[in-house]
Amino acid sequence: QGFMVRKSLGVSSALELDGASVCVNTGTTTELNLADFFRANGMSYEPVVFEKADEVVAAYDAGRCDVHTTDKSGLAAQRTKTAQPDDHMVLPETISKEPLGPVTREGDEPWSDIVFWVLNALITADELGVSSSSVDSVKNDADATPEWKRILGVEGDTGAHLGLGKEWAYNAIKQVGNYGEMYERHVGMNTPLELARDGSL
């Protein structure tokens, strides 16, 4: 969770928001995190609360509050929908971490398992520096770890229990890249959302 402000407010840090009016959804953890952040930093604020998320966005865009707070990914998306996106910025501070990820339909366990394991393979590849451009060399490296040989389908058949071929993880990494590559391509700093990875995955 973070904060979005108009650049004209003249602040570059959430620690400069003492006395600000903040648009927020009522009855949410977002509202609780907001109160905790201001209290922990010895600052005051004026909550401007709404039941629905679109009401919060509309009120912020209409100038009814100085600040909008919600998940940073939501702020980035909502910034692109304002009348003048370049007039707004998401402040650098992350005041709470909200886990966001893929969801699947209840009752389709095979598909849920595939989504879970593919996501884990892409995150592992990112953590270990295996990208869409380097996955072939890792796969063909005789000195690759046994773990990578299994993941990439060189040894064993880890895809069988998922109903997939043995190169399922290799194919995913080769086709879409690791988690970091996907992140940068869809929501990273060179996209309209401009979400920095620092402090997230």
Model-predicted segments: where are they?
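Short beta-strand->loop
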Residues: 1, 46, 82-96, 106
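Short beta-strand-to-loop elements that line the ligand-binding cleft
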Residues: 24, 42-53
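Structural motif corresponding to alpha-helix initiation and N-cap regions
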Residues: 11, 53-54
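Loop/turn elements at helix/coil->beta-strand transitions in domains of secreted/extracellular proteins
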Residues: 19-20, 41-45, 64-65
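C-terminal functional modules
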Residues: 154-201
